[in-house]
Structures are given as structure tokens and as C-alpha cells.
Amino acid sequence: MAHKKAGGSSKNGRDSAGKRLGVKRFGGQQVTAGSILVRQRGTTIHPGANVGCGKDYTLYALVDGVVSFERKGKDKKKVSVYAQ
């Protein structure tokens, strides 16, 4: 009898959609209050002057101004917004 043994099921073959994380406004760019500057998982970049931090660690501008990325100590980064 020509039978075929049942094939095993694969445990692979899934992937999640990208979450569109990263820097949304770069250094030197003009922004308005409420503009999202960085979307991130955890505080990869810390909030500086005139920047707020959402519950999902999204950094956003609190005032109109110019974006500036700076160092915070030796090994941390921060983003600030300076009013023009």
C-alpha cells in the first residue's frame, strides 16, 4: 500500500510587525510643543530641558524650539529642546 507518513509541524514561521521605534526629530530641527522626539523601549535616551517622558518612554517637546542631543555624563544620552 502506498501510504505517506504524516509530516511534522514546524514551530517556526512567525514574525511580528516592526514597532517604528527610533528618533523622530533630529538635532537642529525646529519643533512645536507636543512633538514626539524619540520612541523607545526603556530610557535609551533620557529627557533633558523642556522634554517630557511618556509612560511608554516616548520623549516629547514641552515647548516650541530647537532639538539638541547631548551627553549626560560619560555613557548616557539626553535630548533637550531650547526655545528660540
UniProtKB/Swiss-Prot annotation:
GO terms for biological process: translation. Gene3D superfamilies: 2.40.50.100. GO terms for cellular component: cytosolic large ribosomal subunit. Residues 1-25 are annotated as: Disordered. One of its GO terms (molecular function) is structural constituent of ribosome. InterPro entries: Ribosomal_bL27 (IPR001684), Ribosomal_bL27_CS (IPR018261). Pfam families: Ribosomal_L27. SUPFAM superfamilies: Ribosomal L27 protein-like (SSF110324). Keywords: Ribonucleoprotein, Ribosomal protein. Belongs to the bacterial ribosomal protein bL27 family. HAMAP family: Ribosomal_bL27. NCBIfam families: L27 (TIGR00062). This is Large ribosomal subunit protein bL27. The gene is rpmA.
